[in-house]
């Protein structure tokens, strides 16, 4: 049996979850399609997903069409959940990208299509909601060519009489994109030689599989119009990326979730081989796991199974496997271009309304962050506040909703702030000597620190001979230095610098690695005080797409948001502005752009890196360490 792992992607409200329900219903996997409006869909399982009609977590379901099994991966549609989408793309054999016939190409559509192109995933466009009033399909095609790709091939005609219908497109002009992309076919066309249809179809299929040509289909997911034709295309056009003739097991974890009873489940894509119940599988050089239970998606449900075949998705209860963990032979994993996840740029304080729920909150955050590595938290041991880093406001709203719905915890959050970093201003050295008050540790440590270029990160070097100071002491110094880099003079992480271990002394037999580990961050802090630090803030590359008449307004508003426009381009009556902007300003800039362009403006961003901060210095409380803070304060008094 052929198995296809299909991603369904779209901007918010394009009808993605409704399409999933319609595919399940039309294929016979379910007796009645669920409704987003009624909250009865199979893939939106969180109440907030049902209430708001948006997908928040990647969901997996499946249907069968003749001898083809299709696993559907229903992905989120909001920008705050891009990390969830990117993880899902790695397991796909193909994708259906929805375009709303009513709303056209949205910002998220462009972002998702860009990711699909980078990973060269074969993609079908499905224009949804064609039965709504006022639809102009030629205008939609034109917008797709201008904003997504000119390499589209419209495979269907949409008729209106006696009622709206979808039929195959037999016009020769539909093949223009195929002919223009192939020199031999173009030469035949220019010389008036006849084509064989098999030649055109073969070239279409080759370019589709390479992710460079995009067939366009039509329908209405809500009314099951055009869905049968879409299923037939999915079953015939997409191929499994599983290597042929390979019996050795290879699988990868792409999703982690917890059940209501707090059981931990991992979702694994099997790339080759077969997984059996009671198999013992190697997951690292030193570690193996035994498969004691597993489920596979089958016809809209999850069923227990004794085997999971190559190409399929399997769900395992497991407390060891992490996101991206490999089961079996890593060499057999397909090579795809890596898409760097966006970094959390915001942080806030989260607290419970009822003090007795604090431990429940901490456990819940541990579980949630386990499935989403971009969500991180720590506890300030002085104030006991819980500090949470995240991507955007919608993500924060979702976290609060999950806490209330799944863990029965009422949480409240403070106004978020941008996550800053620090870099030393100049080179400096500092040494703390053994038996010289107020040093209580049996160790001497001397460090130097100097700034590096932005984006260099932290570089560490030991200039102390191993013959003079053994490896365990040297390792302890490095660990202490890296710990000290977590908090600079203003409480932010230290980066873009070189730190050298210049001098060390120990007394045998009283000195221990702990002495060096605890003293090193104190020495580093004193060196930073001599060097001084500058505050760095995250900057974003941005691309603005807007109708040409809004060019002057976009330029005029840029300085208000500290944005620097570096290039301007006019294309298809649309202006494209590229530049840089502080991350703290982007949300207001986006909102302003949406307002003055009446929703026609699109702003795409990606992290550029950290740059010197503009404006006043923003401090955050230091995270204390009871073992070294007393000594820190003693040195602070001496300064």
From Swiss-Prot:
Pfam families: EF-G_D2, EFG_C, EFG_III, EFG_IV, GTP_EFTU. GTP binds at residues 10-17, 74-78, 128-131. GO terms for molecular function: GTP binding; GTPase activity. Keywords: Antibiotic resistance, GTP-binding, Nucleotide-binding, Protein biosynthesis. InterPro entries: EF-G-like_DII (IPR053905), EFG_II (IPR041095), EFG_III/V (IPR035647), EFG_V-like (IPR000640), G_TR_CS (IPR031157), P-loop_NTPase (IPR027417), Ribosomal_Su5_D2-typ_SF (IPR020568), Ribsml_uS5_D2-typ_fold_subgr (IPR014721). SUPFAM superfamilies: EF-G C-terminal domain-like (SSF54980), P-loop containing nucleoside triphosphate hydrolases (SSF52540), Ribosomal protein S5 domain 2-like (SSF54211), Translation proteins (SSF50447). GO terms for biological process: response to antibiotic; ribosome disassembly; translation. Residues 1-244 form the tr-type G domain. Belongs to the TRAFAC class translation factor GTPase superfamily. Classic translation factor GTPase family. TetM/TetO subfamily. Abolishes the inhibitory effect of tetracyclin on protein synthesis by a non-covalent modification of the ribosomes. This is Tetracycline resistance protein TetO. It comes from Campylobacter coli.
């Amino acid at each position: 049996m052929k198995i296809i792992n299909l991603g369904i992607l779209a901007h918010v409200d394009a009808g993605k979850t409704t399409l999933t329900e319609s595919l399940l219903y039309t294929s016979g996997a379910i007796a009645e399609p669920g409704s987003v409006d009624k909250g009865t869909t199979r893939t939106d399982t969180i109440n907030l997903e049902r209430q708001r009609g948006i997908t928040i977590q990647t969901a997996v379901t499946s249907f069968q069409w003749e001898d083809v099994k299709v696993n559907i991966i229903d992905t989120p549609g909001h920008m705050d959940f891009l990390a969830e989408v990117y993880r899902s793309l790695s397991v796909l054999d193909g994708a259906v990208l929805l375009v709303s016939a009513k709303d056209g190409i949205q910002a998220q559509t462009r972002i998702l299509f860009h990711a699909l192109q980078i990973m060269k995933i074969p993609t079908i466009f499905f224009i949804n909601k064609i039965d709504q009033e006022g639809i102009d399909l030629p205008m939609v095609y034109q917008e797709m060519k201008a904003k997504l790709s000119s390499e589209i091939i419209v495979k269907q005609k949409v008729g209106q009489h006696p009622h709206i219908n979808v039929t195959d497109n037999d016009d020769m002009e539909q093949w223009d994109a195929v002919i223009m992309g192939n020199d031999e076919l173009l030469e035949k066309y220019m010389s008036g030689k006849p084509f064989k249809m098999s030649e055109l179809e073969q070239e279409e299929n080759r370019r589709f599989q390479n992710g460079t040509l995009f067939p366009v289909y039509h329908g209405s997911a809500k009314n099951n119009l055009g869905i049968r034709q879409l299923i037939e295309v999915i079953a015939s056009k997409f191929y499994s990326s599983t290597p042929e003739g390979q019996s050795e097991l290879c699988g990868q974890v792409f999703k982690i979730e917890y059940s209501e009873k707090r059981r931990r489940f991992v979702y694994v894509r099997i790339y080759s081989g077969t997984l059996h119940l009671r198999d013992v599988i190697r997951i690292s050089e030193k570690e193996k796991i035994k498969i004691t239970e597993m489920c596979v998606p089958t016809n809209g449900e999850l069923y227990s199974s004794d085997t999971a075949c190559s190409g399929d998705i399997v769900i395992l209860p497991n407390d060891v496997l992490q996101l991206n963990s490999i089961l079996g032979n890593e060499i057999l994993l397909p090579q795809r271009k890596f898409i760097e996840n966006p970094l959390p740029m915001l942080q806030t304080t989260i607290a419970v309304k009822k003090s007795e729920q604090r431990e429940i909150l901490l456990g819940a955050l541990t579980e949630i962050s386990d499935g989403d590595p971009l969500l991180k938290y720590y506890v300030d041991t002085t104030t006991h506040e819980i500090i949470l880093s995240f991507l955007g406001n919608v993500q924060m709203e979702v976290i609060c909703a999950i806490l209330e719905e799944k863990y029965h915890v009422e949480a409240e959050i403070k106004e978020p702030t941008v996550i800053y970093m620090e870099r030393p201003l100049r080179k400096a050295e500092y040494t703390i000597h053994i038996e010289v008050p107020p040093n209580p540790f049996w160790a001497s440590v001397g460090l130097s620190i100097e700034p590096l270029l932005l984006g260099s990160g932290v570089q560490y070097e030991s200039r102390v001979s191993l013959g003079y100071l053994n490896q365990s002491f040297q390792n302890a110094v490095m660990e202490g230095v890296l710990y000290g880099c977590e908090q600079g003079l203003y409480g932010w992480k230290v980066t873009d610098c070189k730190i050298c271990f210049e001098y060390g002394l120990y007394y045998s037999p009283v000195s221990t690695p702990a002495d060096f580990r605890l003293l090193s961050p104190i020495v580093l802090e004193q060196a930073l005080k001599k060097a001084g630090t500058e505050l760095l803030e995250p900057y974003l590359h941005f691309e603005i797409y807007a109708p040409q008449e809004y060019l002057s307004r976009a330029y005029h508003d840029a300085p208000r948001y500290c944005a620097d426009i570096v290039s301007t381009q006019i294309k298809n009556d649309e202006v494209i502005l590229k530049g840089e902007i502080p991350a703290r300003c982007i949300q207001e800039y986006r909102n302003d752009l949406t307002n003055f362009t009446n929703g026609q403006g699109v702003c795409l961003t990606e992290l550029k890196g950290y740059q010197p901060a503009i404006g006043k210095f923003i401090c955050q409380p230091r995270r204390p360490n009871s073992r070294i803070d007393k000594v820190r304060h003693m040195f602070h008094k001496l300064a």
